[in-house]
Amino acid sequence: MNKRLLRSLLSLMVCMAMLLSLTPAVLAESADAPSTEMAVGAVIHGFEVVENGEFALLNAKTTVLRHQKTGATVFFLINEDTNRAFDISFVTPLSDDKGIPHVFEHSTLDGSKKYPSASLFFNLIYQTYNTYMNAATYQVMTTYPVASLSEAQLRKYADFYLDSCFNPMIYEDESLFRSEAWRYSLESADSPLTISGTVYSEMQGAASLETSASYNAMKAAFPGSHMGYNQGGEPTEIPSMTWQEVKDYHTAYYHPSNSLTTVYGAIDDPAAFLALLDEAFSPYEAKAFDFSTPDYTPVTSPVEKVCQYPVYEGTETENAAVTYITFICENATEEEQNVLDLLTMLLSDSSSALVSNLVDVLPNADISVYLETDGPEPAVVFVATGMNEGDVQTLRECIYASVLEFAENGVSQDILDAIASSLTMETALMSEESDLGVNMAQNIAYCWATTGDVHAYEKTIANMDNFEKYQTEGKYAEVAKKYLTEDNQRVITVTTVPAPGQQEAIEADLAAKLAETKAAMSAEEIDQLVADTAAL
């Protein structure tokens, strides 16, 4: 998984067990064990119980079930949290920057066969007892979480989500695609032609040098793989998307065999949820999914490149670049990846030698480090902001020297204690949040999407207990020397710099193309587009 994405919540969970003992009513000491009907081997509404267990940090009893017909996985986490949550997630890989999974995520909740109303989703959000209702597209998955203080309401919302995911209205209604993705707009016959669309506009607003730098770095580190594509969609690419592509994408990936359903909280009648799921899944046959990356071409020698990000003339460019230095950790074992994950947290700590040394040589720069495991190979990624293009060699030398210093001296007990204290404080703040079930469901789904293991998130949390163990055993120094020194030739350095004046050029080019498109329209086409624009 992308550890930078999940780290904040993972860190919050380290001291969860201690906090749960302080949390009244909502999370009591322990949930009742699943009923005998959830015994391993039992079949309930077409689902076979595969295993029962515990998620100690949530005081939850867990049950994993497999749908006999499709192989779909369902994960129950039953405790006494009355803010119950339901989530269904799908692995949705990327092959371009059009943002197809993002558009489908939006259109999914625009109505379905059973619930044919484009406005129903927004009405449901404001219902009594509902505490959360949304959908989100990530680099590797699309997820549909909902939460409620009423179990009966949660089942109704689950039914709405299931029908929306599997029987969306977008198959029959192209206007939903035009509304959510992109469309030509014309206010009047004399107005300039423009492009509109919910996702198109959203991604224009979301564009930034920092996010572009991340995509640039991952494309260079993992060429030919799904890494580095913008899951939300690049505004320059979204208008090349077609309605048929969105429908084909749904057909390819929105299948029970490619799903994980998580049900969390004080669930009195799990069988009722299984009945809903069986009804939604049964029209499908089991299907095998292959998410390998046959076009991936591994980098075998050092790579360095500079990418430009368009900004307006006059934009401040001093200390505005972002540099990614990615170390491919070839054939790193699962244990080595666990060590690297915690090592990156130690290197990122404000008291670390890396941070201290960087202040001395590049006082305007900030650095963070994370373990990337979403790609075809694990990698440790150093991200420096507040950079200039000419600072790259200084940054690289600082990283190498600091890693060697760390390998020689290890980490002080003071830093270990400081990290533990910080995690305790963050966990205390988390206890005040209301969406624990939703957050847990999404993180479980994300880890499952990248590993195929429904317990991967639990294992990542458990690894947090190994901070001092790895130090005592010399594991940090071992992996640091093996993967993060100049001996590793598989290092990719990508700096993204602002390019003043390019944004004006892009906008002028788009305006010229739109003017050309309008000039080619007939009078009847223009009148129809004006009417369509008014209707939308």
Regions found by a protein language model. Give the residues of each.
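N- or domain-start disorder-to-order transition segments that initiate the globular core
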Residues: T36-D81
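Bacterial N-terminal signal peptides that target proteins for export
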Residues: M1-M13
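Bacterial N-terminal signal peptides
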Residues: S11-S21
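Helicase-associated low-complexity regulatory tails and linkers flanking the ATPase motor
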Residues: K3, A60-T63, S292-P294
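Short acidic-hydrophobic surface loop/beta-edge motif
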Residues: K61-K69, V303-G314
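Charge-rich, well-structured scaffold segments of protease-associated domains
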Residues: P34-A42, S107, G111-P298, N319-T323, ...
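Sec-dependent signal peptide cleavage junction
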Residues: L19-A33
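Active/ligand-binding-proximal structured segments within catalytic/core domains
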Residues: I78-L120, L124, E334-L347
